[in-house]
A protein has these predicted regions:
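Conserved donor-binding/catalytic core segment of Leloir-type glycosyltransferases
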Residues: 2-6, 190-199
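Active-site proximal beta-strand in glycosyltransferases
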Residues: 3, 85, 102-119, 141
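N-terminal strand-loop element at the rim of the active site
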Residues: 5-66, 161
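Nucleotide-sugar donor phosphate/pyrophosphate-binding loop at the beta->alpha transition
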Residues: 67-71, 110, 117-137, 149-157, ...
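Glycine-rich phosphate-binding loop signature in dinucleotide/nucleotide-binding domains
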Residues: 78-84, 190
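Short His-centered aromatic/hydrophobic patch
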Residues: 88-96, 115
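A short, active-site helix/loop in glycosyltransferases that binds the activated sugar's phosphate group
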Residues: 137-176
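A short helix/loop element that forms part of the nucleotide-sugar donor recognition site in Leloir-type
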Residues: 175-190
Length: 199
């Protein structure tokens, strides 16, 4: 099976990059041929590219500039139409027509679009992007339900082809708890007026 994953860059200081690294390093790369289409890592950041390449991921490095990356993706897909899966990490309205471009150039690929963001306010342009994503993508992932709704539409989480990729905070496990707060403060001798940040 041949997979194309599209992301921004491979610096290790971001959740998206860490998600990509963790996913690919835990994938059986003897069964799956993975091409990772990414922008060049900023020079001031450590890159996870060496670890991915050592594991067998083929990295296609392109400029970390949105317009240049779209042009490079178009050129790549014109000559590489044999992907079974395209996993597209997206965070913008421009990703919607890019999803359409992928569908036209690789009509047999299963397209997975993956949102990691929630940036209100919602605009009419975003509403149009929702429709375009829903027209061309096969599956929808969000790092949380809110991220899925923001990029793909208000009710996307009601569709059977939407899933949460668990790299967000699980609010059923991590939430304010008055009893736990009181117990921790008592255990460490921290008064109610003192500020406490937990990491």
């Amino acid at each position: 099976m041949k997979i194309l994953m599209i992301s921004n860059h491979l610096g290790v200081q971001s959740g998206v990059q860490r998600y990509v690294q963790n996913l690919l390093l835990n994938l059986d790369l003897t069964r799956y041929q993975v091409d990772l289409f990414v922008g060049l890592c900023p020079p001031d950041q450590a890159s996870c590219a060496p670890a991915l390449e050592a594991a067998g991921v083929h990295i296609i490095a392109v400029p970390d500039n949105k317009k240049a990356r779209i042009r490079a993706l178009y050129q790549h897909l014109k000559t590489h139409k044999d992907y079974d899966i395209i996993h597209y990490h997206t965070a913008s309205k421009i990703g919607a027509p890019v999803c359409g471009m992928m569908r036209v150039l690789c009509p047999h690929a299963k397209i997975i679009v993956h949102s990691h963001i929630v940036y209100p306010p919602m605009t009419l342009t975003w509403r149009a992007a929702h429709l375009v994503y829903q027209l061309f993508a096969d599956y929808f992932l969000g790092c949380g339900v809110a991220a899925g709704r923001f990029v793909f539409g208000d009710h996307i989480d009601r569709r059977p082809n939407f899933s949460v990729a668990c790299n967000a905070v699980d609010q059923t496990r991590f939430y304010p708890n008055a009893a736990a707060r009181t117990a921790i403060r008592a255990q460490y001798g921290i008064t109610e007026t003192e500020r406490l940040a937990g990491f």
